[in-house]
């Protein structure tokens, strides 16, 4: 601290100018909160300034939507700066400070439906993020911690058997042949260029400690140390979401079990569920999605209203910021927090069934207004427009 500066004076002089900012962090970081927390540190040395710097550096604007503007530096960041993060989380997820995320539920047998008409559903995918307990999250982790995560996770993956068995490809030693194969399969992730990851520190030391693992069937995939410690993905062509969810649950359970055998656990908060880098990715951190062809509904002005009522989001065929090719959209659940994994997959399944029915009716020249009650009664979790635009998973 500067000589002759009191704690309060330093806080006032160091408070960031957020007067022209348009992000969630800036909406909730009052001077009173900053003065309360600026000199607090987590057990790993993470400060509030570390958590908010990405939002200070990237103010956003009203034309491109409201970015999150903050990250967690470790699993203690939430509890250490609780009053601030509670406000951020409530805006993003409509999840109040007294709410509690439910227990994990990966039981595929409780899923109702989930096998779609392949005339409409071209592929199914479920992915989630997870973090290794006791290690800083990517914005604050050291090279040693990143390499430890790579070792712990890749060793666990090496213990998978039968249809989950596969191979790990470290980015640092990847040869041209393997790289070409991964690019062809659309598995390879590149160095992050987005503001959240670069200014928060997630992309430091690239590609050190990063890698990709996939099973021999190429329908179960794991990214290590991209935005989060672990990204687990189950996918396949066609309309069998039940099979995708079953494989996802088995793989996720086995990876966690194999890690525990070596003395490592996943980060999980009693109130918020699983913890990852961005406050948008809490709870289940699950994004279930389909590539869905809607040649008729896409032309109807009610398309976006249907999606909103079903609590679903849409992207182009190639993902975020891409266009739909051959009327095919990436449709996914918006919520991450407040319901179990199985419940969120059910939200997607129910919603996709409604969208397919609407498309069929429009093709036949039939009305779709009577589907509205089904939309209003559909299961799901409310989530803000902020989260719908900025879920990074």
Swiss-Prot record:
CDD domains: creatine_kinase_like
Keywords: ATP-binding, Kinase, Nucleotide-binding, Transferase
Matching PROSITE patterns: PHOSPHAGEN_KINASE (PS00112), PHOSPHAGEN_KINASE_C (PS51510), PHOSPHAGEN_KINASE_N (PS51509)
Record region (Disordered): 367-393
Cellular component per GO, a single term: mitochondrion
Lineage: superkingdom: Eukaryota
Entry's Gene Ontology molecular function annotations: ATP binding; creatine kinase activity; guanidinoacetate kinase activity
A Pfam family of this chain: ATP-gua_PtransN
Reactions that this protein is recorded to catalyse: guanidinoacetate + ATP = phosphoguanidinoacetate + ADP + H(+)
Location of the Phosphagen kinase C-terminal domain: 120-362
EC id: 2.7.3.1
Tagged with keyword Transferase: yes
Domain Phosphagen kinase N-terminal stretches: 7-94
Binding site for ATP: 123-127, 186, 231, 287-291, 315-320, 330
InterPro entries: ATP-guanido_PTrfase, ATP-guanido_PTrfase_AS, ATP-guanido_PTrfase_cat, ATP-guanido_PTrfase_N, ATP-guanido_PTrfase_N_sf, Gln_synth/guanido_kin_cat_dom
Example GO BP: phosphocreatine biosynthetic process
Low complexity bias: start-end ranges: 377-393
Family indicated by similarity: Belongs to the ATP:guanido phosphotransferase family.
Quaternary structure (record): Monomer.
Protein name: Glycocyamine kinase
């Amino acid at each position: 601290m500067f000589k002759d500066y009191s704690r309060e004076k330093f806080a006032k002089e160091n408070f960031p100018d957020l007067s022209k900012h348009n992000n969630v962090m800036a909406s909730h970081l009052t001077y009173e909160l900053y003065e309360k927390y600026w000199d607090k540190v987590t057990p790993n040395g993470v400060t509030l300034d570390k958590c908010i710097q990405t939002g200070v550096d990237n103010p956003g604007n009203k034309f491109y939507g409201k970015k999150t503007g903050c990250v967690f530096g470790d699993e203690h960041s939430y509890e250490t700066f609780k009053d601030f993060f509670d406000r951020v989380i409530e805006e993003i997820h409509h999840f109040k400070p007294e709410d509690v995320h439910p227990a994990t539920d990966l039981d595929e047998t409780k899923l109702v439906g989930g096998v779609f008409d392949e005339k409409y559903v071209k592929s199914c995918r479920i992915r989630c993020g997870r973090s290794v307990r006791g290690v800083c999250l990517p914005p604050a982790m050291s090279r040693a911690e990143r390499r430890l995560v790579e070792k712990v996770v890749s060793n666990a993956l090496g213990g998978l058997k039968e249809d989950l068995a596969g191979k790990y490809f470290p980015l640092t030693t990847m040869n041209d042949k393997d790289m070409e194969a991964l690019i062809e399969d659309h598995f390879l992730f590149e160095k992050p260029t987005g503001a959240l990851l670069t200014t928060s520190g997630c992309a430091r030391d690239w590609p050190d400690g990063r890698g990709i693992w996939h099973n021999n069937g190429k329908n179960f995939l794991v990214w290590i140390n991209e935005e989060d410690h672990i990204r687990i993905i189950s996918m396949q062509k066609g309309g069998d979401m039940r099979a995708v969810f079953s494989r996802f649950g088995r793989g996720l359970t086995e990876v966690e079990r194999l890690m525990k055998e070596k003395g490592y656990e996943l980060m999980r908060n009693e109130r918020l569920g699983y913890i990852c880098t961005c406050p948008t990715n809490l709870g289940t951190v699950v994004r279930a999605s389909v590539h869905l062809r809607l040649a008729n509904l896409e032309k109807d002005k009610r398309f976006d209203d249907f999606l909103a009522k079903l609590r679903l989001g849409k992207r182009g065929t190639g993902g975020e910021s891409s266009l739909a090719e051959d009327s095919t959209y990436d449709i996914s659940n918006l919520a991450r927090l407040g319901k179990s994994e199985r419940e969120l997959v059910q939200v997607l399944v129910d919603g996709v069934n409604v969208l397919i029915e609407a498309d069929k009716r429009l093709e036949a020249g039939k009305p779709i207004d009577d589907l509205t009650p089904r939309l209003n009664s559909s299961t799901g979790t409310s989530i803000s427009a902020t989260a719908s635009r900025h879920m990074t998973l």
